[in-house]
């Protein structure tokens, strides 16, 4: 079958209109290849068909810069959506939105390629059992448990440790569960993407991860599709290799933002706050593919940027409806030197429920939150009148809350260079046992410092013993 070839008739920014012979129009979402006749060494420009305008013209979104395109240039229909290489060959590599390597390590020799657009798994294929995914991070496992095949939002400003938590999870899932991670860099800083690559290389977790980048400097077409490229990679590991996969998206807001940038160029009427009218549909098509099936699961952690801290903005508000939980990082906690700087009172998880995690886990988690909340309420009194004015009961609450607060800190494997302390993976039962002991007053004789930057409660007891011996 001869290639279906059209000609460019108009270029407006990232949007390219192509005219095809009558009766040979490419399907919507098909990829078109445009060769640059002036530079035969340059890779083809890939465009994705977005609309049929009539008169045999299709409107497409370019996945790369459109400089140098002229009317009359040929565009060939590939007959299928954008295809990306998947499988073991993609691990340890950086790809762009169309599956081309950008790490200068040569071609990706994958046996199989998958389209980036696929239907979400059927209802009958989905796994209805709710399971907890152990991350080995105490504060997460105890208070904000991750559901297998769920979606968690990671909220935090600049410099409070979002990327370090993401890297530690990639490390723990790879080392403890032998799991694969896929990282989608959507519209974020190229420098951060470069840093993440080198840090993961140094931490030895790169060979268990595939990185797909479409950063800030890319045109909106690439940023609006790079999350789908990453999802196609993750789906292969779930459906074919039967793996539990972690999918990291940094940042999900940029996916929506890119959609709104091309929406106006496609001639759609904007909706609230200038976003695309298809905001809910676009996000739903992505999020519904992230789920547990009978073969494996994709658990997603998505960093969410909240524009102007307005949680009612349509982009974060639409994202919230898909999330199973929120992990909020707090600058106040980071200032105390407690890392991971997770806010135990602001963060929530749908599966912190006695029917899912068990009565003991649920009871300990809620008691920890109660003690920390009481401490927060007492802080104003302490600041004005000092500790001496508190009742004996309140003094005990404050002492235990401060121990709990410090015990929520933990040395990370990927942060060994900063902390000088070897990283620790803490099993869920050890986490529950430790916090239960603090709540029951079993460790009231230990100093607050004994609980800081340790793994399990045994490490705190060792610290105490060492101090006693001195």
UniProtKB/Swiss-Prot annotation:
Q: What class of enzyme is it?
A: translocase
Q: What is its EC number?
A: 7.1.2.2
* SUPFAM superfamilies in alphabetical order: C-terminal domain of alpha and beta subunits of F1 ATP synthase, N-terminal domain of alpha and beta subunits of F1 ATP synthase, P-loop containing nucleoside triphosphate hydrolases
Q: Which residues bind ATP?
A: 156-163
Coarse class of the protein's main subcellular location: membrane
> Could you tell me which InterPro entries the record lists for this protein?
AAA+_ATPase, ATP-synt_VA_C, ATP_synth_F1_bsu, ATPase_a/bsu_AS, ATPase_alpha/beta_chains, ATPase_F1/V1/A1_a/bsu_N, ATPase_F1/V1/A1_a/bsu_N_sf, ATPase_F1/V1/A1_a/bsu_nucl-bd
Keywords assigned by UniProt? ATP synthesis, ATP-binding, Cell inner membrane, Cell membrane, CF(1), Hydrogen ion transport, Ion transport, Membrane, Nucleotide-binding, Translocase, Transport
Q: Gene Ontology terms, cellular component aspect?
A: plasma membrane; proton-transporting ATP synthase complex
List, alphabetically, the Gene3D superfamilies matched: 2.40.10.170, Bovine Mitochondrial F1-atpase, Atp Synthase Beta Chain, Chain D, domain 3, P-loop containing nucleotide triphosphate hydrolases
Membrane topology annotation: Peripheral membrane protein
Q: What does the subunit section of this Swiss-Prot or TrEMBL entry state?
A: F-type ATPases have 2 components, CF(1) - the catalytic core - and CF(0) - the membrane proton channel. CF(1) has five subunits: alpha(3), beta(3), gamma(1), delta(1), epsilon(1). CF(0) has three main subunits: a(1), b(2) and c(9-12). The alpha and beta chains form an alternating ring which encloses part of the gamma chain. CF(1) is attached to CF(0) by a central stalk formed by the gamma and epsilon chains, while a peripheral stalk is formed by the delta and b chains.
User: What is its biological role?
Assistant: Produces ATP from ADP in the presence of a proton gradient across the membrane. The catalytic sites are hosted primarily by the beta subunits.
Please state what the protein is called: ATP synthase subunit beta
């Amino acid at each position: 079958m001869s290639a279906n070839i059209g000609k460019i008739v108009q270029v407006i920014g990232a949007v390219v209109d192509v005219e095809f012979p009558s009766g040979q129009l490419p399907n919507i979402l098909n990829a078109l290849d445009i060769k640059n006749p002036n530079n035969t060494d340059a890779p083809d420009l890939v465009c994705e068909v977005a609309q049929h305008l009539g008169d045999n013209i299709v409107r497409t979104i370019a996945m790369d810069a459109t400089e140098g395109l002229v009317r009359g240039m040929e565009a060939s229909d590939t007959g299928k959506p954008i295809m990306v290489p998947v499988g073991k060959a993609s691990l340890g590599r950086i790809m762009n939105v169309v599956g081309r390597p950008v790490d200068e390590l040569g071609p990706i020799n994958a046996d199989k390629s998958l389209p980036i657009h696929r239907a979400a798994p059927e209802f009958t294929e989905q796994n209805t059992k709710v399971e907890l995914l152990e991350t080995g991070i105490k504060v997460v496992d105890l208070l904000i448990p991750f559901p297998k095949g769920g979606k968690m939002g990671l909220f935090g400003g600049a410099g409070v440790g979002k990327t370090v938590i993401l890297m530690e999870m990639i490390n723990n899932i790879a080392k403890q569960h032998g799991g694969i991670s896929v990282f989608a860099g959507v519209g974020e800083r190229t420098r951060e993407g470069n840093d993440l690559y080198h840090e993961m290389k140094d931490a030895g977790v790169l060979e268990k991860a595939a990185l797909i980048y479409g950063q800030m400097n890319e045109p909106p077409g690439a940023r609006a599709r790079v999350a789908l490229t990453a999802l196609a990679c993750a789906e292969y590991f779930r459906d074919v290799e039967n793996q539990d996969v972690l999918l990291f998206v940094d940042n999900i807001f940029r996916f929506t933002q890119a959609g709104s940038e091309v929406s106006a160029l496609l001639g759609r009427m904007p909706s609230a706050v200038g976003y695309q009218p298809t905001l809910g549909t676009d996000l739903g098509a992505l999020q519904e593919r992230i789920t547990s099936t009978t073969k494996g699961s994709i658990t997603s952690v998505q960093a969410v940027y909240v524009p102007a801290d307005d949680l009612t903005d349509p982009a974060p508000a639409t994202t919230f409806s898909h999330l199973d939980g929120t992990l909020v990082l707090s600058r106040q906690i980071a200032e105390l030197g407690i890392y991971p700087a997770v806010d135990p009172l602001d963060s929530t998880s749908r599966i912190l429920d006695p029917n899912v995690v068990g009565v003991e886990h649920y009871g300990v988690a809620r008691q920890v939150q109660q003690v920390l909340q009481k401490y927060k309420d007492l802080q104003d009194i302490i600041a004005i009148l000092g500790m001496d004015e508190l009742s004996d009961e309140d003094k005990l609450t404050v002492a235990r809350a401060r121990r709990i607060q410090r015990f929520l800190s933990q040395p990370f494997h990927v942060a060994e260079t900063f902390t000088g302390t070897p990283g620790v993976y803490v099993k869920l039962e050890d986490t529950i046992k430790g916090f239960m002991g603090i709540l029951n007053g079993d460790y009231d004789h230990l100093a607050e410092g004994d609980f800081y930057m340790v793994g399990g409660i045994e490490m705190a007891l060792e610290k105490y013993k060492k101090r006693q011996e001195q």
